[in-house]
């Protein structure tokens, strides 16, 4: 299977006043496969507003298209998961993501943030109930269903940015699910996505002993 992609990207930053900054961009893409062409226009915009000296708000919107899909038929991650491209039958996955966050820098050398997001997806792929790729991947287009997905969550973070010891600690509460046509996968009812992680904690610490020696430690909980 041969495919070709042509893409272009442009962005610019705007400082409207001393408090308000804006970033706007767009990604244009043309993907050609099996005598079928898919064109996508993917705009993105982000804005930051400085409420007071130590408090800022940030919001963003991003539209994306993806020309490969991840297919897996097991409830756990396997090395045999398949990445498959779009075809004449299989459309690109498209998503719209919104985010809103607040940032506090009132303590010297520290930054605290809270950010929420919501992502809506369409043309997501899953194997039909009772079907898997084991044995052969031939004819996989007839073994899958296309549906909708969503992902949402909130992340809290504390970050130390100055001094010999730096790092950050974050906690994320999130949810990701899928929904297919009635009579299809799970009889059309929403169900958790395979890689749904409701709670996650990440800790990273770096310490610089001198100009030549530093050490870093990371820990993650899912």
Where are the regions a protein language model picked out?
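Extracytoplasmic loops and strand-loop junctions of Gram-negative outer membrane beta-barrel proteins
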Residues: 1, 25-31, 79-87, 95-96, ...
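Short sequence motifs at beta-strands and strand-loop junctions characteristic
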Residues: 2-4, 16, 35-39, 89-94, ...
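Surface-exposed extracellular loop regions of Gram-negative outer-membrane beta-barrel proteins
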Residues: 2-35, 40-44, 49, 54-98, 118-141, 160-177, ...
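Hydrophobic, lipid-facing positions within transmembrane beta-strands of outer-membrane proteins
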Residues: 4-10, 26, 41-47, 96-100, ...
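Repeated loop/turn-to-beta-strand initiation elements of outer-membrane beta-barrel proteins
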Residues: 19-22, 54-57, 108-112, 164-169, ...
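Transmembrane beta-barrel strands of outer-membrane/channel proteins
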Residues: 24-30, 59-63, 81, 102, ...
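Gram-negative outer-membrane beta-barrel transporters
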Residues: 118-120, 138-222
């Amino acid at each position: 299977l041969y495919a070709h992609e042509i893409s272009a990207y442009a962005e610019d930053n705007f400082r409207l006043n001393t408090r308000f900054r804006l970033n706007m961009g767009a990604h244009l893409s043309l993907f050609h496969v099996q005598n079928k062409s898919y064109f996508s226009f993917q705009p993105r915009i982000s804005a930051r507003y400085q409420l007071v000296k130590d408090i800022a708000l940030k919001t963003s919107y991003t539209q994306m298209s993806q020309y490969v899909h991840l297919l897996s038929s097991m409830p756990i991650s396997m090395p045999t998961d398949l990445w498959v491209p779009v075809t004449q039958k299989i459309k690109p996955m498209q998503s719209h993501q919104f985010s809103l966050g607040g940032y506090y820098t009132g303590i010297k050398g520290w930054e605290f943030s809270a950010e929420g997001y919501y992502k809506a997806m369409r043309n997501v792929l899953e194997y039909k109930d009772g079907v898997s790729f084991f044995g052969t991947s031939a004819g996989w287009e007839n073994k899958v269903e296309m549906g909708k997905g969503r992902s949402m969550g909130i992340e809290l973070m504390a970050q130390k940015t100055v001094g010999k010891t730096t790092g950050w600690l974050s906690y994320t509460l999130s949810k990701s699910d899928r929904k297919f046509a009635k009579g299809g996968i799970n009889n059309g009812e929403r169900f958790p996505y395979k890689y749904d992680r409701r709670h996650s904690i990440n800790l990273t610490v770096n310490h610089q002993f001198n100009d030549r020696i530093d050490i870093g430690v990371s820990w993650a909980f899912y």
